[in-house]
């Protein structure tokens, strides 16, 4: 790596850009994004500022910086420039979504508003405290005191059409419809899979469940999520122990930056968890699930872990079709 020069992308959603000011390429700082460039001799300084990122070397190769070490990958010229353009488009969508939420909050009261009926009735939820509003679908059971399943979609279904989350969760509610349980399907606003927006969305999910007018068994609330939704499930179980009767995070993770010490693992022991992941998942790394599954087993927690070595970031469909996750959830109940 002698005499190499590196470039990488920094994002204000994940780190403070100010310390990188001396390295920012001219004209590349926009909407909380910046391209930085530095020599190999400055690599130690960058390591102290960034925990994990991708670097593009002047030799045309991609390098992975992770926890202070650097690993050379394949030849990928202009990969950082392409990433910068992609995330600029992403930020524009995120800003439009934030502006829409701000407009909605300015003339909407707190709580649930029904938009239309049907098998999966459409609603809008406004949470002034967490400064967020989003649509959701709800299927009420014909019988009282039935369990509630909360299904959280992946990042690809974010938006405001109140439809994408239905298709994203299709393998789940195909299994659940025959149980005649209550089913809740929120749709996360675009851009709520990172930073403060993600935390606001996560907290508002719990508030929405609290405010649902349906007559369901509050000792049997089950939460299931895929990818981004799986990450939300881990966070909800951590933030609200002894609230959910069981949780199924699939292809998610509680601590993707691997700074495990910042979480009190004892909070996770209080909820039965069935995690599922594939070791070849390159979208959401398996490390966090590996760590917490092992640690929770040591503590004697009610933890199941399905760990596959193929299917990558598409393993959720097969998991939902072939594993008895619904029956497992229904066997759990809060005391």
Question: Model segments located where?
Answer:
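N-terminal accessory nucleic-acid engagement/regulatory domains that precede
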Residues: 1-33, 38-39, 51-54
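Solvent-exposed alpha-helical segments and adjacent loops
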Residues: 32-105
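Active-site machinery of serine-nucleophile hydrolases
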Residues: 148, 152-202
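Gly/Ser-rich "nucleophile elbow"/oxyanion-hole loop immediately N-terminal to the catalytic nucleophile
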Residues: 193-227
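Primarily recognizes the serine-hydrolase "nucleophile elbow" in alpha/beta-hydrolase
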Residues: 219-266
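C-terminal catalytic histidine-bearing segment of alpha/beta-hydrolase fold enzymes
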Residues: 276, 282-293, 297-335
């Amino acid at each position: 790596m002698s005499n190499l020069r590196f470039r990488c992308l920094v994002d204000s959603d994940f780190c403070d850009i100010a310390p990188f000011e001396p390295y920012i390429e001219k004209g590349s700082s926009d909407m909380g994004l910046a391209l930085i460039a530095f020599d190999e001799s400055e690599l130690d300084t960058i390591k102290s500022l960034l925990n994990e990122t991708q670097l593009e070397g002047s030799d045309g190769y991609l390098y992975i910086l992770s926890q202070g070490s650097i690993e050379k990958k394949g030849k990928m010229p202009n990969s950082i420039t392409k990433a910068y353009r992609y995330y600029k488009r992403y930020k524009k969508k995120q800003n439009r979504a934030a502006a829409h939420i701000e407009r909605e909050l300015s003339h909407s009261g707190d709580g649930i508003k029904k938009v239309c009926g049907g098998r999966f009735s459409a609603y809008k939820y406004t949470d002034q405290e967490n400064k967020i509003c989003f649509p959701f679908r709800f299927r009420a059971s014909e019988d009282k005191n039935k369990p509630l399943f909360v299904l959280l979609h992946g990042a690809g279904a974010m938006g405001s059409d109140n439809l994408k989350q239905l298709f994203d969760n299709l393998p789940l509610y195909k299994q659940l419809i025959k149980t005649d349980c209550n089913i809740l399907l929120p749709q996360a606003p675009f851009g709520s899979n990172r930073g403060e927006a993600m935390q606001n969305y996560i907290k508002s999910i719990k508030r929405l469940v609290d405010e649902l007018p349906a007559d369901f068994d509050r000792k049997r609330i089950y939460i299931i999520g895929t990818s981004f939704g799986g990450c939300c499930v881990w966070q909800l179980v951590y933030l609200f122990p002894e609230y959910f009767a069981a949780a199924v995070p699939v292809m998610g993770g509680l601590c993707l930056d691997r700074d495990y010490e910042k979480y009190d693992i004892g909070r996770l022991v209080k909820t039965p968890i069935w995690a599922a992941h594939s070791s070849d998942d390159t979208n959401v790394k398996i490390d966090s699930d590996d760590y917490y599954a092992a640690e929770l087993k040591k503590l004697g927690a009610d933890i199941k872990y399905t760990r596959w070595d193929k299917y990558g970031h598409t393993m959720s469909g097969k998991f939902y079709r072939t594993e008895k996750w619904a029956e497992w959830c229904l066997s759990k109940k809060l005391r």
